[in-house]
Design a protein with these regions (language model features):
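Structural detector for helix-capping/boundary residues
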Residues: 63-64, 81, 100
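Catalytic donor-sugar/metal-binding loop of nucleotide-sugar-dependent glycosyltransferases
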Residues: 49, 75, 84-102
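Short, hydrophobic alpha-helical packing/hinge segments within bilobed ligand-binding/sensory domains
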Residues: 83-84, 113
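Long helical/loop segments within the catalytic core of UDP-sugar-dependent glycosyltransferases
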Residues: 2-76, 114, 118, 125-129
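Generic structural signal for helix capping and beta-alpha/helix-loop junctions
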Residues: 21, 104-105
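Structural beta-strand/beta-sheet cores of well-ordered domains, especially the beta-sheet scaffolds
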Residues: 57, 90-92, 111
Length: 154
């Protein structure tokens, strides 16, 4: 992450992995989800030189962004997705650092996983209602710089 920052990135996300992938099928499912997110979304976006998306933990944001916004101003239920959407709208590119790996402990019960996924779904809709129209407009005017809500929240 330090090299990514030193190369001029103002925000970057890491490869988020599951610490307890071998606990059961639920935690293993999260590991597969994170692998998909890393390889097929963020790595692809890095290759195409478009903005990646912050998801959960394991990311950095430069002090410049925090200062310019008067602190951390993103407070929707899924503030990571909100930050990503807002960054795209402001023309800030989020990078991806594939060599930085963060291990998160994931839910192992269906109930905990369900509750978390339900919270994420509600957060997605919050971001969609706050940012969806502006993101869609950005797709029409500058397809490379913008991302649709469905793409950013994948």
């Amino acid at each position: 992450m330090n090299k990514t920052f030193d190369n001029g990135a103002v925000a970057s996300t890491s490869y988020r992995n599951s610490k307890n992938y071998d606990s059961n099928w639920i935690s293993a499912g999260y590991a597969v989800w994170f692998l998909r997110e890393a390889k097929f979304l963020n790595q692809a976006r890095l290759t195409l030189n478009t903005s990646c998306a912050v998801s959960g933990t394991g990311f950095f944001v430069s002090a410049k962004i925090i200062e310019r916004n008067g602190g951390w101003k993103w407070h929707l239920l899924t503030e990571d997705i909100e930050f990503s959407a807002n960054s795209i709208l402001e023309g800030e590119r989020i990078s991806y650092t594939p060599t930085a790996v963060l291990y998160d402990e994931q839910p192992v019960t269906f109930r905990d996983s369900w509750n978390q996924r339900f919270r994420w779904a509600k957060g997605f809709y919050q971001v969609f209602w706050h940012y969806g129209a502006r993101l869609a407009k950005g797709i029409a005017t500058n397809p490379k710089a913008a991302a649709s809500p469905a793409t950013i929240c994948s």
